[in-house]
Amino acid sequence: MAEPTVCSFLTKVLCAHGGRMFLKDLRGHVELSEARLRDVLQRAGPERFLLQEVETQEGLGDAEAEAAAGAVGGGGTSAWRVVAVSSVRLCARYQRGECQACDQLHFCRRHMLGKCPNRDCWSTCTLSHDIHTPVNMQVLKSHGLFGLNENQLRILLLQNDPCLLPEVCLLYNKGEALYGYCNLKDKCNKFHVCKSFVKGECKLQTCKRSHQLIHAASLKLLQDQGLNIPSVVNFQIISTYKHMKLHKMLENTDNSSPSTEHSQGLEKQGVHAAGAAEAGPLASVPAQSAKKPCPVSCEK
């Protein structure tokens, strides 16, 4: 298979298995040596596949071990983890009936979350429930995504598109920590998280807004939104890596692109932060050329 086809197939396999897998497990689905597979993943880069070395816990099955994988440094056995990443997004303006064609997916956001009241009779919904329309197929093709079914695309979007997260509280994002200007505090029905972090744009290494997506206060909100916790964990892993990468780039005084050696360093540095982000919250809760681009974030 040509490399773009291989990458698309790898994304399909990853999303059929929850959006992330150990490298050794992914290897079982392709006729490539481990060295060749790693080369494909590294060439595609973290914009497509996030490849990180993590510490595993012995005595667990593959699925349990993958879910429990954390930062390297605890003295346990390490393995390489692969997370599916994509810049494909749902179009925000389409949700409001304001866009006919652009470089983002024209698909019902509520249906993607399994919450559209017309999901059993999609012809009564004014928004498309079909990922195979000409517009959507062109968008997927431009992102190098071929052959994904709706469930696989859903997994990919859930762990990459901030549009599908609960609505972020804007009052929380203003004023001082702990709650900003939000008087509802823990009773607020909006997401108390750094708005810039979920968009991959937070420039602060030490931010007074929360970068933790999963904690006791947010668990019910996430579940009510129709999100599964593994997908949110994947979003956390990807966002933590992006935050560290952005901060490192801002520190680079000559504004040059990070070197290969620097990027490899982020593979390990990023997983330390992501591992810590996973461990804390989870432990505290019950276990085209002429088309005009649209804004990235969804307005609800």
Curated annotation (Swiss-Prot):
Residues 252-263 have a biased composition (Polar residues). InterPro entries: WH-like_DNA-bd_sf, ZAP_HTH, Zc3hav1-like. Keywords: Acetylation. The modification N-acetylalanine is found at residue 2. Residues 252-300 are annotated as: Disordered. Residues 271-283 have a biased composition (Low complexity). Pfam families: HTH_53 (PF18606), zf-CCCH_PARP12 (PF25261). It comes from the Eukaryota. One of its GO terms (cellular component) is cytosol. This is Zinc finger CCCH-type antiviral protein 1-like. It comes from Homo sapiens (Human).
